Amino acid sequence: MNGKNLKEKSSIKYLPQRRKAVSLIGLGIASIPFLGVIEGIIWGKFDYRIRRKIIYFDDLPEEFDGYKVAQLSDIHMGSFNIEDYKKIERGIQMLNEENPDIFFFTGDSVNNYAEELKPWLPLLKKIKAKDGKISILGNHDYGIYAYGVDNVKKQQENINKIQEFHEEINWQLLKNESLQIKKEKSYINIIGVKNWGEGNFPKDGDLELASKNIKDGDFNILLSHDPSHFDAHVKTYYKKIHLTLSGHTHGMQFGVEIPGIAKWSPVKYRYPKWADLYKEKDRYLYVNRGFGYLGFSGRVGIWPEITIIELKKTV
């Protein structure tokens, strides 16, 4: 047998093994997205992350220098099972360990029905904040996806029940109104509006009504569920809104985030301001990625969020 024939037979012998190896590698690569989805369904939706921001303001009252704000949004308690209690409790414990001065919830307590909140009231009542717990409505809190957009009576009943539940856990629900947080002789205003969103979402948020007691020179924080409200009205509003806190987008519960390098989700094509901190001139918007989930029963790359913001006075 000459060398040429030996080489040909050797190639024939090992070619199927090479094909098998390449097939296995290809299968492994192809399975990565599938495994990512499985991971997101089993663990990702409970992989709570604390997102920290320090924001400086020239006109923050000195008494509020270092004031710590905690924010949750889009808890969607109707998506969870009671077997998830311990996992969700861990997220609440993470928030409480931050020892916030004030707690804000920026809408979407439920998916459709107020009653979805009821089993979770004892757990949500465990949230602690020294100066109070303030909440607003999101589009899902209206019940429009269950009762229809024209059934105003049922919507109002749903909202009233949600307000009762919020009161039961010591969350003060603001519906186009404001309140003051006082420290010594200084104060800041917390403004809360009903849902206002671009497109077919409810546009009940009335910034003029909600800020009627705000004076020139006041320091103002706005709670508004949908971040599209910021670009549509808030950033150019004649009364200065220093910081707006929103949610709504969930970061689509899918995307890629590499801190300091990349942040992408398909939701960016619907909401340009879809997650984290944005600034327009001297006004800030923070968009929380959501604590719960809706639709897809998981999170891939965009993890459930607990926001901690420290307000600082510029020296």
Report each predicted region and the residues it spans.
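N-terminal signal-anchor transmembrane helix
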Residues: K9-S11, L15, I42-E97
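Active-site-proximal loop/helix segments of hydrolase catalytic cores
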Residues: G197-G217, L223-T244
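Active-site neighborhood of phospho(di)ester-bond hydrolases with catalytic His/Asp-centered motifs
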Residues: L72-S73, F103-G107, K133-N139, L174-N176, ...
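Active-site-proximal beta-strand elements of phosphoester/diester hydrolases
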Residues: G66-S79, Y187-W196, I221-H225, Y284-R289
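Conserved beta-sheet core of the metallophosphoesterase superfamily
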Residues: P227-T307, V315
